[in-house]
Amino acid sequence: QKIQDPRFTSVEVDAGDLVALEGLIKKVNPDVVINAVDPRFVMQIFTAAQNTGVNYIDMAMSLSKAHPTDPFHKTGVMLGDEQFAQAEAWEKNEKYALIGIGIEPGMSDIFARYAQDYLFSEIDAVTILDGSNLTVDGYDFAPSFSIWTTIEECLNAPLLWDNGKWHTSEPFSGGVVFDFPEGIGPVECVDVEHEEVVLIPKKVKANHVSFKYGLGADFINTLKTIHALGLSKKEKVNYRGMEIAPRDFLASLLPDPAKIGPLMHGKTCAGAHVKGLDKEGKPYACYIYNVVDNQWSMDNYGDQAVVWQTAINPVIAMELIANGTWKPRGVVGPEWMEPKPFLDLIEQYGSSWHIRDEDPAGLAL
């Protein structure tokens, strides 16, 4: 029904076919290409926009490649490296590629930039914390986001920023139990690979940056089992004459995250825990966050909470670019932009953001 809305037209295209993508972009001649596709196809769509001279927005960045000999200590190709490598070409063409403007990355990065500009004189640590109490009727294991992407970011070596350098660690390390707001409560969180750890240090001066995902013990154990059985592999294997990637097969067995909204209950939270010195030089810590209730998003938009929470951010970004408030140029992340106009619009779009004071001696390490 949404696709049949007269304000929109739809067309089928292979997101992995660069020539087909370029042909479609030339035919439509848009002001901006918005990439909401699986991150495996980021570089094809990004390159197609670049080759056709069209602005670009995405909500997840180009994939990483592990260090060949020491993957749990040293970085290889980091998230977004392939995109940032083209920054000079985008600037020369006087076009923008605003990358990582979903909820995480995206709103979370804007929270970090806001903290630097308005709340802190010195930042020791920024810890992005994502957690929920979402349940899905009839399923013991039903990720609210792409299982392909969930496996990618949780089983890859977590990326960390410490004292001016990026490094990696073992999957599921750095565990803490964080008490999420608005009734979500305590959730076990672990370090994972995520774009914020690449983006935030480029524009926010902090000694430490990490991303901790509130998976919970059961989800973590399930992912460990998936990995132990080899079902997390994205390389194709031959099974009785058929070529199939175990991860793709696993994804086909699980419910589509876009269709489980009516079965979902609970809330999801995304935010930045920031610790340092406030503008008066006193120790201070806070959690800047956004919570979406699944019942609210289903009632008002017909979309489940995680989908809606992600999708609203590029819409706000496009409005700010269209009215001239934001003027991106080249390859940039959310931190490059003034945060307050974005946060003001969150309220106008029916959502909200909040600041909860935290113990300056706790977390964010």
Predicted regions and their residues:
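Rossmann-fold NAD(P)-binding glycine/threonine-rich loop
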Residues: 60-95
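Conserved Rossmann-fold cofactor-binding substructure of NAD(P)-dependent oxidoreductases
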Residues: 12-29, 37, 41
